[in-house]
Design a protein with these regions (language model features):
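Flexible assembly/topogenesis modules
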Residues: 1-175
């Protein structure tokens, strides 16, 4: 399960070049976290869209491992060109702070750094299957963009300006 995360050895999230969180061995880390936080029926809905289905055995034999069979059927069944796949991984699956962070971030550059790993751990296959290769041709990052109405935007600018001035005054009065 969780095979896509095994394609990377490190994933880092940064705001304006300031590292917020870095996950080493995201395959193992997100698998352990997912086992603790996702209910057993998670794979029947949203989980399968991120290739999350629990294995029932340690083998890649469809007759023995129903989790492996479900993932394989999902990949093959998708209406895409043979040999291609597409999945959605929410940031909260990777980074712990995303689970409960609900603030709007204004004026910062967001950076997601993915360091690729070999395919050895990412491809779960039977002993009879040949070694595969995963080529990542494109990764898309969807970030919600809030564009408030003009009046709300003006109020937000005033609030930000007031807080910046207060912060600057605190810094100048420090002795």
């Amino acid at each position: 399960n969780n095979g896509l995360m095994y394609l990377f050895k490190q994933i880092t999230y940064a705001l304006s070049n300031q590292e917020i969180e870095s996950v080493y061995n995201p395959g193992q880390a997100t698998t352990m976290l997912g086992m603790l936080k996702y209910p057993d029926d998670f794979a029947k809905a949203q989980g399968l869209n991120q290739l999350w289905t629990k294995d029932t055995t340690a083998t890649a034999v469809i007759a023995e491992n129903t989790g492996f069979g479900v993932r394989q059927a999902h990949i093959i069944r998708k209406p895409t060109v043979k040999g291609t796949f597409s999945f959605i991984i929410p940031l909260k699956h990777i980074f712990g702070f995303c689970d409960d962070y609900d603030k709007i971030v204004y004026g910062f550059k967001h950076t997601l750094t993915l360091v690729r790993k070999t395919d050895d751990d990412a491809i779960f296959r039977s002993n009879a299957a040949g070694a595969g290769k995963v080529h990542i041709g494109r990764i898309s990052w969807f970030m919600p963009h809030v564009d408030p109405a003009h009046m709300a935007k003006m109020q937000l600018y005033k609030t930000i300006e007031t807080k910046v001035k207060r912060l600057m005054n605190k810094n100048t009065h420090v002795t």
